[in-house]
Amino acid sequence: MRTITTICLVRHGQTDWNALGKLQGQTDIPLNELGRIQARQCGEFLSKEASWDVIISSPLKRARETADIISHYIEVPVIEKMEFIEKNFGVAEGMTAAERASAFIDKEYPGQENQESLRSRLMNGLQDIQREYPEKKVILVAHGAVIHFILRLMSNESIVSNEMRLFNACLSTIRFEVDSWIIDDFNQVNHLS
């Protein structure tokens, strides 16, 4: 069986809003100093781990900055793809978990992107990667909800649940073999000190 495409999913480093527990969504918040350190640790680890062909990034600052820092270590181009922008959480963006729980008991946030829209754009993005980078090793820098959704889809929710939290700068690896995606590992943070 031959591996067609391998993707290392990297969640962006920490931002001030992450530190405060605020939901970011598509609000364009940059990395903080710890986030830049985490991105450097990702870059150092990934440079020793394998030979990479390309980095694909969400266009949001926190992901793009993480991707640019990683690129410094592995010297491959960074390509932005809108398909991997974070989920739009509507009016809940900027709110803490406590504020959201108080304001939206049912967790339905007015103006948020629906699951079908998110699934559709993420699957389109993954199919583009598969088509454009066959038999390549790809780093995809994205966001918590995006990576979580991809992992849930790939595992049929068998190993990744709704409640699982992805850490900033965590690494998860998926590969496409023959006609299906396989999760090799997820939410790894051993590279962070």
Stretch-by-stretch model annotation:
Residues 15, 146-147:
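Short active-site segment of divalent metal-dependent hydrolases/proteases
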Residues 48-51, 129-137:
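Glycine-rich phosphate-binding loop signature in dinucleotide/nucleotide-binding domains
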Residues 7-65, 111-123:
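Loop-to-helix element that buttresses phosphate recognition and phosphoryl-transfer chemistry
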Residues 158-182:
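Domain-level recognition of soluble alpha/beta enzyme cores
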Residues 184-193:
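Short, solvent-exposed aromatic-acidic interface loops
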Residues 7, 136-144:
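Generic beta-sheet signal
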Residues 99-117:
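Short glycine/proline- and acidic residue-enriched helix-loop micro-motifs
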Residues 41-103:
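Phosphate-coordination/substrate-recognition cap region in phosphate-metabolizing enzymes
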